């Protein structure tokens, strides 16, 4: 689990991202599943809050996931971009997320 910003929690489990957004209307859960996320080591490439919307860019390998979350309503938009074969998210600055699977493996070790 990773606290992205106050009120937004991100959980990665195999090929699914779950966003928990606390709004004035209550807690809203949104799931994003993609085969490109399977066993992916996600990195937060950028995050910015503008006019009540969180703009989040996550990356893994050659994939970028541009995510916009309305902090008021919890609604979300996602866009997946494939980078050219000569570019990898690993070369970009950012912080890697710890997945649920990684934590389970650490506990069993």
From Swiss-Prot:
**Domain of life from the UniProt record:** Viruses
**InterPro entries of this UniProt entry?**
Bunya_NSs
> Keywords in UniProt for this one?
Eukaryotic host gene expression shutoff by virus, Eukaryotic host transcription shutoff by virus, Host gene expression shutoff by virus, Host-virus interaction, Inhibition of eukaryotic host transcription initiation by virus
Q: What's one Pfam family here? A: Bunya_NS-S
Gene Ontology BP term (one): viral process
S-S bonds:
none
User: What family is this?
Assistant: Belongs to the orthobunyavirus NS-S protein family.
Q: What's this chain's function?
A: Inhibits host transcriptional machinery, by producing modifications to the phosphorylation state of the C-terminal domain (CTD) of RNA polymerase II. Inhibits phosphorylation at serine 2 in the heptapeptide repeat (YSPTSPS) of the CTD of RNA polymerase II, suggesting that the elongation step of transcription and/or 3'-end processing is prevented. Inhibition of host transcription machinery leads to shut off of host cell protein synthesis and inhibition of the host innate immune response. NSs also seems to be involved in the nuclear relocalization of host PABP1.
What is the official name of this protein in its record? Answer: Non-structural protein NS-S
- Recall the taxonomic lineage recorded for the source organism: Viruses, Riboviria, Orthornavirae, Negarnaviricota, Polyploviricotina
């Amino acid at each position: 689990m990773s606290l992205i910003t106050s009120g937004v929690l991100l959980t990665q489990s195999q090929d699914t991202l779950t966003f928990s957004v606390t709004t004035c209307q209550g807690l809203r859960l949104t799931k994003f599943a993609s085969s490109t996320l399977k066993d992916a080591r996600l990195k937060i490439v950028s995050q910015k809050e503008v006019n009540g919307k969180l703009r989040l860019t996550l990356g893994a390998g050659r994939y970028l996931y541009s995510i916009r979350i309305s902090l008021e309503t919890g609604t979300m938009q996602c866009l997946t971009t494939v980078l050219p074969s000569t570019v990898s998210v690993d070369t970009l600055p950012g912080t890697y997320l710890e997945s649920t699977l990684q934590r389970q493996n650490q506990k069993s070790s």
